[in-house]
């Protein structure tokens, strides 16, 4: 649902949906990716970067792994 909302330009709804998905399963990288892209699309690069950092921390603590290349690629739209 969050991905469809983001495609329709409904960034606030996409952020809420992705956050809800992460409350249910914090290891779901696709939800992290959508949340990062939603913040970027909404013009909030700081929030996108903080979201990525939270994702990285959760994955490291829970699984001992780093975010996937797809999750890192979600940051590609950030300035600078």
Describe the function of each predicted region.
Residues 1-80:
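Intrinsically disordered, charged and Pro/Gly-enriched terminal/linker segments
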């Amino acid at each position: 649902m969050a991905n469809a909302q983001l495609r329709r330009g409904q960034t606030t709804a996409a952020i809420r949906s992705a956050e809800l998905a992460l409350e249910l399963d914090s290891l779901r990288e696709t939800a992290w990716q959508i949340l990062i892209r939603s913040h970027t699309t909404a013009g909030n690069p700081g929030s996108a970067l903080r979201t990525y950092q939270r994702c990285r921390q959760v994955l490291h603590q829970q699984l001992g792994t780093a975010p996937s290349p797809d999750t890192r690629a979600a940051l590609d739209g950030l300035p600078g």
